[in-house]
A protein has these predicted regions:
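Amphipathic, non-transmembrane alpha-helical scaffold segments
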Residues: 15, 23, 65, 69, ...
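Hydrophobic alpha-helical connector segments
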Residues: 67, 78-106, 155-158
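Amphipathic alpha-helical packing segments from all-alpha helical-bundle domains
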Residues: 81, 89-93, 121-145, 156, ...
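Amphipathic alpha-helical segments used for helix-helix packing
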Residues: 102-126
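Hydrophobic alpha-helical segments that form the core
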Residues: 150-171, 180-188
Length: 197
């Protein structure tokens, strides 16, 4: 067997790329099926790696969950990082209806992780808390930029509204709660800006 064939086999099954395949499979499985419902065997199989290779990259399933959350954190953690819109538009964009493509709505991956990790994965819980705080801080910063009289209050109200919309959409598998939340957000934002004038 040539060295090239051995290298190709190592790359396709383990080796370089294995860590990313594990994280990609984790993102799909943890979100769609849940963290606790996804066993290490299934995660390894979906990643096309052995359990041994999985454990060479991650010390435990909790470590996989932590890295999965860190890998998606930047996409959702700070709404103030969005560009190309006014602060008010960026606040409202948080409430755009997510598209599930026919799949069941699963809500916020960080909320889901908090529920599934309760008491058993302190590292996961800390990542979730930090992400949720950063999210609320981002909303507060946008509220300040939009001219809200009390930006911290508005940021916290919008964070609670977001969590409620995500939870209700997930519970009912119905995205209409996002439109209702957006309408409520418009009212809150406009009142907060008007009260400053």
């Amino acid at each position: 067997v040539s060295k090239q064939r051995v290298a190709q086999h190592a790359t396709s099954k383990g080796g370089r790329g294995a860590r990313q395949r594990i994280l990609d499979a984790a993102a799909e499985l943890f979100y769609r099926e849940g963290i606790n419902a996804t066993g290490v065997e299934r995660l390894a199989a979906e990643s096309s790696v052995s359990k041994r290779t999985l454990y060479q990259h991650f010390s435990s399933k909790a470590a996989v969950v932590e890295e999965y959350l860190r890998s998606i954190e930047q996409r959702v953690a700070n709404p103030a990082a969005a560009v190309g819109q006014t602060p008010r538009e960026r606040l409202l964009a948080v409430f755009d209806t997510p598209t599930a493509g026919g799949a069941p709505l699963r809500g916020c991956p960080f909320h889901n992780a908090a529920v599934e990790a309760a008491g058993g994965m302190p590292g996961v819980q800390e990542i979730v808390r930090a992400t949720k705080r950063n999210f609320a801080d981002g909303l507060t910063e946008l509220a300040r930029q939009a001219g809200a009289a009390r930006p911290r209050l508005l940021g916290n109200q919008l964070a609670v509204l977001y969590e409620g919309a995500a939870a209700l959409a997930t519970s009912l598998d119905d995205s209409s709660s996002w439109a209702q939340a957006r309408t409520a957000a418009e009212t809150l934002i406009d009142q907060a800006i008007a009260s400053r004038k």
